[in-house]
Amino acid sequence: LFGLCLYFVIMAKGKKLISLKYWKYCLPLALPIILHLLSGLVLGQSDRVMLQSMSGNYEAGIYSFAYTIASVLSLLWSATNNAWVPWYYENTKANNTKGINQLAKKYILLFSLGTCTIMLMTPEVMKILGPEEYWSAGRVIAMVVFGIYFNFLYTFAVNYEFYSQNTRWIAVGSICAAAVNVGLNLLLIPKFGGMGAAVATLISYFALFVFHNIIAARLGGFNISKRLYLYGISIVSVGFTVINLTYDFPVLRWIIILLLGFGLIYFNRKVIEEQLKRYLKKDKTQ
């Protein structure tokens, strides 16, 4: 209701219902983004809908439970991306490629270690949050987490595409990835159920990452080094291998989790020190 009131106020002040000048500028930018968002919806939801249709409610319920736990990584990615984008646009405009890649390396390292930590913790988290009949979803969670990690990596390219205002190609890359997802679900779900849907999710998000990086490279001026991707993917691949090898060895897994935790603290030590100094300084002034 408040928004509707604002709309009428703005329209009254504008004194013009339609401005062809702004429509010509906005529509070519906005319409492809609608297709991009719809493709993202298909990519994120089609596996559960198709799994329910092909394998029944029980299989879909277990997979949805696994996906919900894995989506914690999506929340982390969304929060960090909101902080990254303004800084990235500002430094891209200033042509600060070196500074961008230096920070991107730290960003990817921290997110990769965080991804590995979430992967390794999933068996215990799953047992705390879900009933015993859902515990079989553990390996599915790791697969979906790996897929969401590629969704994180794809944002480096898509952020540049938005910066270049070439939204037509954004839609093309996302539509292709959504088509890959639907096709793989049709192929894998009847044979492998929830695990098939998880594999389809991983491959589809990888395809999304590849498509958008090809597009960003073709636009020219894309300033993220490809070596940083290999750096991050290698770390998460090791984490994915470790969770599959140590799934039934919780003590060993938690030793690795603690080591990762110390690693995160070590790489963030300067930030932690600065925050502690600010807190202590603030405490003294009070």
Predicted segments, located by residue:
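Membrane-interface helix-loop junctions in multi-pass transport and translocation proteins
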Residues: L1-F2, R168, I175-V210, N244-L258
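Alpha-helical transmembrane segments of polytopic membrane transporters and translocases
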Residues: R48-V49, E59-W77, K105-K106, G147, ...
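Interfacial/gating helices of multi-pass transporter permease domains
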Residues: Y25-L29, I33, L51-S71, W135-R139
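Interhelical loop/hinge segments that connect adjacent transmembrane helices in multipass membrane
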Residues: G3-G44, A83, W87-K98, G220-G232, ...
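Helix-loop junctions and terminal segments of transmembrane helices
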Residues: A70-K105, V158-Y163
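Alpha-helical transmembrane segments of multi-pass membrane transport and lipid-handling proteins
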Residues: F2-L6, W77-T80, N101-N151, V182-K191
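Membrane-interface junctions at transmembrane-helix termini in multi-pass inner-membrane proteins
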Residues: G14, V145-C176, A216-R218
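Membrane-proximal transmembrane or re-entrant/amphipathic helices at the cytosolic face
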Residues: I243-Q286
